[in-house]
Amino acid sequence: MRLFLSLPVLVVVLAMVLEGPAPAQAAPEISSTLERIPDKLKEFGNTLENKARAAIESIKQSDLPAKTRNWFSETFNKVKEQLKTTFS
């Protein structure tokens, strides 16, 4: 009984696959795709620029750079003092 039902389903699926894509799903022409490449690249560049600017502004406004700088300064001074006391 299962084989009797699965064969027609298999035939219908095979027919749909062999039919190919519908006209609305067909790939666009190469020339139209090539014409849109500069616009897409410009849009990508603008988006990337905006995101980079936003990230840089976020970093500038955060306390992370100042905290990092202070930590490095403190650590460097501690190491310098330890070296002075060790080799003096």
Swiss-Prot record:
Highest taxon above the source species: Eukaryota
Subcellular location: Secreted
Classification via Pfam families: ApoC-I
GO molecular function terms listed in the Swiss-Prot or TrEMBL record: fatty acid binding; phospholipase inhibitor activity
GO biological process, one term: lipid transport
Record keywords, A-Z: Lipid transport, Secreted, Signal, Transport, VLDL
Entry's transmembrane regions: none
Gene Ontology cellular-component terms listed: high-density lipoprotein particle; very-low-density lipoprotein particle
Entry-linked Gene3D superfamilies: Apolipoprotein C-I
Signal peptide: 1-26
PANTHER family, alphabetized: APOLIPOPROTEIN C-I
Family designation: Belongs to the apolipoprotein C1 family.
Protein name (record): Apolipoprotein C-I
UniProt source species: Arctocephalus gazella (Antarctic fur seal)
